[in-house]
């Protein structure tokens, strides 16, 4: 009888634990997961490539969020929600990253987004290549080259 009472308490508890919020385990980032160093930006129309390999500009993917950050701290950082569909990376809901005063939703393009290879407020990129060490994204205007950090 005592065993039945214990099991009647423990089994529902285990069920609740296994079915609880899954935000931490949902990984929409898939192969994009982690930190990527932006090493160059190629302007497709001109063929001009800007070398950023000595800069500290990073895209970091985790769960459903993307953080754009210049590690010097001299340029604004940004947050995006993202979705991947058929090798298309769609960025939405851009925020100015400001932990001290609260993040601010962007309603207009900011020129400092260009530092990260972003040329419009909510771009869509084609994932041209991705493996454990390299990633190439293309939005039709620029091609972004990344190394996994």
Name each region found by the language model:
Residues 1-10:
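Bacterial N-terminal signal peptides that target proteins for export
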Residues 11-15:
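Residue-level signal for mature regions of secreted extracellular proteins and peptides
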Residues 17-20:
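C-terminal motif of bacterial Sec signal peptides marking the signal peptidase cleavage site
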Residues 22-37:
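N-terminal helix-cap/turn-to-beta initiation motif at the start of protein domains
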Residues 33-35, 62-67, 130-136:
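Short, hydrophobic/aromatic-rich segments at coil-to-beta transitions
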Residues 42-53, 64-130:
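Contiguous, well-ordered beta-strand patches that form the walls/edges
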Residues 79-87, 130-149:
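Edge beta-strand at a domain terminus
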């Amino acid at each position: 009888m005592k065993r039945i009472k214990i099991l009647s308490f423990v089994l529902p508890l285990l069920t609740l634990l296994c079915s609880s919020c899954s935000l931490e385990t949902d990984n929409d980032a898939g192969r994009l997961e982690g930190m990527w160093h932006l090493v160059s930006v190629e302007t497709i129309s001109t063929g001009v490539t800007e070398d950023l390999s000595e800069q500290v500009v990073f895209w970091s993917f985790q769960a459903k969020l993307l953080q754009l950050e210049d590690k010097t701290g001299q340029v604004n950082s940004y947050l995006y929600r993202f979705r991947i569909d058929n090798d298309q990376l769609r960025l939405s809901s851009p925020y100015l990253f400001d932990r001290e005063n609260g993040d601010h939703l962007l309603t207009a393009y900011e020129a400092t987004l260009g530092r990260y290879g972003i040329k419009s407020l909510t771009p869509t990129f084609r994932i041209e290549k991705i493996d454990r060490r390299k990633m190439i994204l293309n939005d039709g205007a620029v091609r972004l080259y990344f190394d996994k950090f």
